[in-house]
From Swiss-Prot:
Pfam families documented for this protein: Flavodoxin_NdrI
InterPro entries: Flavoprotein-like_sf (IPR029039), RNR_Ib_NrdI_bac (IPR020852), RNR_NrdI (IPR004465)
Family: Belongs to the NrdI family.
Gene Ontology biological process terms from the UniProt entry: protein modification process
GO molecular function: FMN binding
Stored Gene3D superfamilies: 3.40.50.360
Function: Probably involved in ribonucleotide reductase function.
Protein name in UniProt: Protein NrdI
Organism, as annotated: Cronobacter sakazakii (strain ATCC BAA-894)
Amino acid sequence: MTRLIYFSSRSENTHRFIARLGLPAARIPLEDRERLRADEPYILVVPTYGGGGTAGAVPRQVIRFLNDEHNRALLRGVIAAGNRNFGEGFCRAGDIIAHKCQVPFLYRFELMGTGQDIDNVRKGVSEFWQRQH
């Protein structure tokens, strides 16, 4: 059961956060030639790119993944990572995806997240899926 799908750049910050969560997850590939297809409803975990603006905030691999109508139809919520140095642009990728895909923006965390973020996301993801049934 893969209930989380995530993207992580070569910095691996989001990957480390997912590893610490200890929940089943699938990774959107870094390389364009590789594809991931969702096979059940999922929550997307995504980093925010750029310097706080809207342009370029959502990684192109995530855009390509969500441009697949099948993948987009199974999206149920979004969690975003960001850098508070970007001010109002903090976790902007989550805002953009939630708005465009009409799903809830469930949580935001900075960089690799804290222990409290890990606890909050574990609890929040569990409660979210319980409410979906």
